[in-house]
Amino acid sequence: HHLVRTVPPSGRIVVNGLEESLARVLHTGCWSTVSSFGAAVSDFSAVGDPQAFDVLHQGAAVARVQWSLTGVHNQLNALAAIAAAHHVGVPVPQAAQALANFQNVKRRMELRGTVNGIAVYDDFAHHPTALRTTLDGLRRSLGADARILAVFEPRSNTMKLGAMKSQLPWALENADLAFCHTAGLDWDAADALAPLGVGPGQRAQTAPDIDTLVSQVQQAAKPGDHIVCMSNGGFGGVHDRLLRALS
């Protein structure tokens, strides 16, 4: 709430209308104009797939966004950007066109290469919610029949502590196969992933080092697969090592 209080009455607060916690914060006191996005009753909302959707302003369709980014989280980011731009005088159709020309940043579903029909991506996702939104976005883009292989390392401090390990099966629901790099962990990753089934031929596997991890993925991958490597670090150069192994 301190952050809300620092915004002057002449300012604008752009808030995710889907988050009840934010609504509670604003309810404790707000002296600025608020623009909401995301929910159907918000000032700015979306109808359609995250890669191609109509933008509604106060319930009326005013523009359409077609871009390369996937996932509901990116759709919400787009609405937030449109709302902020609208506040400073940018017409919504102009903002939507700018998003159509937007080139995504590095390490956000960045395609590192394709070999033998197998695509390898790099993504910065490093906690369960980020893993889930990344994989959900790819699943929505590819459809139900494509195979997604999630390769990840719990590298952030909270993940190393195991504070969110119970959420990993939920985070990986949209992955056909999951491979976890376990170096440096003080908790049992195989136990945390047990609901998925762990071991050779199962839905999930664990690896104590990068060499083992690359070998596991190489043996499992097939033409047409999409491999998503997720970490907030360098991940031992696993992306390039996978591309070499798969070639």
Question: Where are each of the predicted segments found?
Answer:
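ATP-dependent carboxylate-amine ligase
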Residues: C30-T33, A60-A61, T70-H73, L79-S247
